[in-house]
Amino acid sequence: MKILVVEDENSLREVIVRSLEKERYVVESASSFREASLKINDYDYDCIVLDIMLPGGSGLTLLKELRALRKKDSIIIISAKDSIEDKVTGLDLGADDYLTKPF
């Protein structure tokens, strides 16, 4: 399984990547909207772990673009935004799950 972790906070991104690699997943990472967009366009992922607030753009915009392209990647949002409205918005846009930070 190939996973893309999109998170701008370096230490959190590294912890997530290491944890997934320890479970023997193939993991790549991106720290900005642009870097994530390029990787998503160039590679197929089975799962994308996606922060909402990114330098250069919103993770929700990436989510909308992925779903508009009918990409079937599993998408898990990770965000410090923890209101019911934020969670409903993410799930309504096509996320498969929504996890709040810290976790």
Segments and roles (model prediction):
Residues 1-103:
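N-terminal/domain-start alpha-helical segments
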